[in-house]
Amino acid sequence: MNKYVVILAAGKGTRMKSKLYKVLHKVCGKTMVEHVVEAAKGTNPDKIITVVGNGAESVKDVLAGQSEFAFQEKQLGTGDAVLAANDLLENLEGSTLVATGDTPLFTAETFNNLFKKHEESGNSATVLTAKAPNPFGYGRIIRDEDGNVLRIVEQKDGTPEELAVDEINTGVFCFDNKELFKALKQVGNDNAQGEYYLTDVLEIMRKAGHKVGAYEMPDFSESLGVNDRIALAQATKIMQRRINEEHMRNGVSFIDPDTAYIDSDVKIGNDTVIEGNVVIKGKTEIGSNCYITNSSRIIDSKIGNNVTITSSTLQEAQMDDNTDIGPNSHLRPKAVIRKGAHIGNFVEIKKAEIGENTKVGHLTYVGDATLGKDINIGCGTIFSNYDGVKKFHTNVGDHSFIGAGATIIAPVNIADHAFVAADSTITKDVEKYDMAIARGRQTNKPDYWHKLPLAKDKEWE
């Protein structure tokens, strides 16, 4: 049986009070509509069609290559939105699942189960339902004695008996495709909002003698629709719990999973430990047996095995195996830390490669530089790379030693086995085995203390 998915993503979402269109708000690193498309892909459909309206070009940019698109010119209800896909689907055999782009928590498993139930039951329409702990505000599912759906009763229209039902409409449906578009052409807009409702299709099909059923999914939380910032935070919390639990099932330890924020595309190896208040975002990959301490923030970075990150920030950076950093250090874009290197506290590295077993201990800035292996960079060293107009590069060879407080003014090359004395300002190349000293000579002034202002009118021994 052919399968199609229609995702409704034309609404602006005024309750979000945002310039960003509702379905483009992110949950754990992906837009809401991307989460829905990802779940849809898990059903191996023949077509995914996203109905766009407000912010159409922005939504198309996000979903480029993942979906076909239909355009809803005016937002005249869910029935009108599905009808916008008429030209792409009308005459096709198969089943069509309809979902909304603001429900990011639905899983591929749930969508697959809905397709399966729909096809096995021989329904023309199947409603995805759930048991709600508090069904207030939801449409209630009213079934007949055989379990078929008679109608969906909205909160404002229900009798006390109907409102006592806790099975609710999640807003996701599966239809016989041809019957869907035949029924949509019969939907009217004789209601207070003047809109065309997709739910009216159920009554049209039932009256035509078609079977309308339901599939009750076990996890009500999947059905959460996001209409405001409160619901966005709730969806993020639920998604985050899922992500962290999946990592834990795969061998990752979380000291406090409730406070660790991990984006959905992050990969983490087994035996890695994540402390609380850690943020890991984007396409970050972390190897096995790593330790990430509290208050670390890692974005779009690649981390090898046996790496320790202590309360530090990494952005578009790379740390190879057996390296460590922190506390309170910062790897900026294109920072590469090679195997065995040590980055200490209060170090900033930008667009620089730190070679194997090199140590950059503390209070240092390394920018636009290539450092070889087995180098020691002393405390307070500055790689001065910018003249106010251009950035310049520095090279430091293997087995070199840079003393504390040195300033390396690029462009300059320091050869293998070179030595830079502490507090030197280096402006010229340093050759192999040479030591560079560039600082003023010390001069001692005998008995000068008594000439200083602080010594006047005071008794000093």
UniProtKB/Swiss-Prot annotation:
EC number: 2.7.7.23, 2.3.1.157
Annotated stretches, region: Pyrophosphorylase: 1-229
Spans annotated as Linker: 230-250
Region (N-acetyltransferase): 251-461
Keywords assigned by UniProt, alphabetized: Acyltransferase, Cell shape, Cell wall biogenesis/degradation, Cytoplasm, Magnesium, Metal-binding, Multifunctional enzyme, Nucleotidyltransferase, Peptidoglycan synthesis, Repeat, Transferase
Entry coiled-coil feature ranges: none
Membrane spanning stretches: none
Catalytic residues, chain numbering: 362
Ligand binding (acetyl-CoA): 385-386, 422, 439
Record's cofactor remark: Binds 1 Mg(2+) ion per subunit.
Reaction it catalyzes: alpha-D-glucosamine 1-phosphate + acetyl-CoA = N-acetyl-alpha-D-glucosamine 1-phosphate + CoA + H(+); N-acetyl-alpha-D-glucosamine 1-phosphate + UTP + H(+) = UDP-N-acetyl-alpha-D-glucosamine + diphosphate
Residues where UDP-N-acetyl-alpha-D-glucosamine binds: 8-11, 22, 72, 77-78, 139, 154, 169, 227, 332, 350, 365, 376
Entry cofactors: Mg(2+)
GO biological process: cell morphogenesis; cell wall organization; lipid A biosynthetic process; peptidoglycan biosynthetic process; regulation of cell shape; UDP-N-acetylglucosamine biosynthetic process
Chain sites annotated for binding Mg(2+): 102, 227
InterPro entries: Bifunctional_GlmU, GlmU-like, GlmU_C_LbH, Hexapep, Hexapep_transf_CS, NTP_transferase_dom, Nucleotide-diphossugar_trans, Trimer_LpxA-like_sf
HAMAP family: GlmU (MF_01631)
Family indicated by similarity: In the N-terminal section; belongs to the N-acetylglucosamine-1-phosphate uridyltransferase family. In the C-terminal section; belongs to the transferase hexapeptide repeat family.
Task performed by this protein: Catalyzes the last two sequential reactions in the de novo biosynthetic pathway for UDP-N-acetylglucosamine (UDP-GlcNAc). The C-terminal domain catalyzes the transfer of acetyl group from acetyl coenzyme A to glucosamine-1-phosphate (GlcN-1-P) to produce N-acetylglucosamine-1-phosphate (GlcNAc-1-P), which is converted into UDP-GlcNAc by the transfer of uridine 5-monophosphate (from uridine 5-triphosphate), a reaction catalyzed by the N-terminal domain.
Record's subunit section: Homotrimer.
Protein name: Bifunctional protein GlmU
Gene encoding the protein: glmU
